[in-house]
């Protein structure tokens, strides 16, 4: 069984009009949509912030307001959702950063037994999305902590970073992860 974890592929990150747009990320939805049929399970992780989130500059954090719950910026690309619907895979959503007082870059900090079982039953866990130097990289580290290192494949051409990509490359190299 193969699982793809699509990290924070939300309009505020991939759309040039988004508040935290990552250069070049507008090409990711079509690339990821083309890959979706290869996988049995699709996990979307979502930044899912309240307006008073601690990470926002107006509240003492470092980021502009982004990915507000139920907003345009928090939404997923239609073409990826259509690909999932057409392929009829098992789909799951993981909301993070949804408590105003807590920053949460990585997915699976609050993993359920069912989520962990699904991941452990996967022969391959492909990881892609935004941003490699924050949420993608820390999600990979969390998957490693959960004992899933040998199953991880980083989809580099579907992953963008705020930095020059060196943080994610360091995580890949340090952990000898597979890439595609």
Model regions and ranges:
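Active-site-adjacent betaalpha module
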Residues: 2-5, 10-14, 24-41, 50, ...
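Polar, low-complexity loop segments and adjacent catalytic/binding residues used for recognizing
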Residues: 54-66
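Short, well-structured hydrophobic secondary-structure segments
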Residues: 43-45
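Short acidic, glycine/proline-rich loop/turn micro-motifs
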Residues: 15-19
């Amino acid at each position: 069984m193969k699982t793809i974890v699509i990290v924070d592929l939300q309009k505020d990150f991939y759309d040039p009009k988004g508040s935290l747009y990552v250069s070049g990320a507008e090409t990711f939805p079509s690339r990821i949509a083309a890959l979706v049929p290869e996988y049995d399970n699709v996990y979307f992780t979502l930044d899912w912030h309240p307006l008073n989130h601690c990470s926002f500059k107006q509240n003492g954090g470092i980021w502009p307001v982004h990915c507000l719950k139920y907003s345009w910026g928090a939404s997923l690309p239609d073409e990826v959702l259509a690909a999932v619907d057409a392929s009829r895979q098992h789909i799951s959503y993981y909301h993070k950063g949804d408590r105003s007082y807590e920053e949460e870059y990585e997915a699976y900090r609050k993993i359920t037994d069912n989520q962990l079982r699904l991941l452990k039953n996967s022969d391959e866990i492909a990881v892609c999305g935004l941003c490699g130097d924050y949420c993608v990289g820390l999600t990979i580290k969390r998957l490693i902590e959960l004992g899933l290192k040998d199953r991880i494949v980083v989809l580099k051409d579907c992953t963008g970073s705020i930095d020059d990509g060196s943080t994610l490359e360091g995580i890949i190299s340090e952990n000898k992860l597979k890439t595609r």
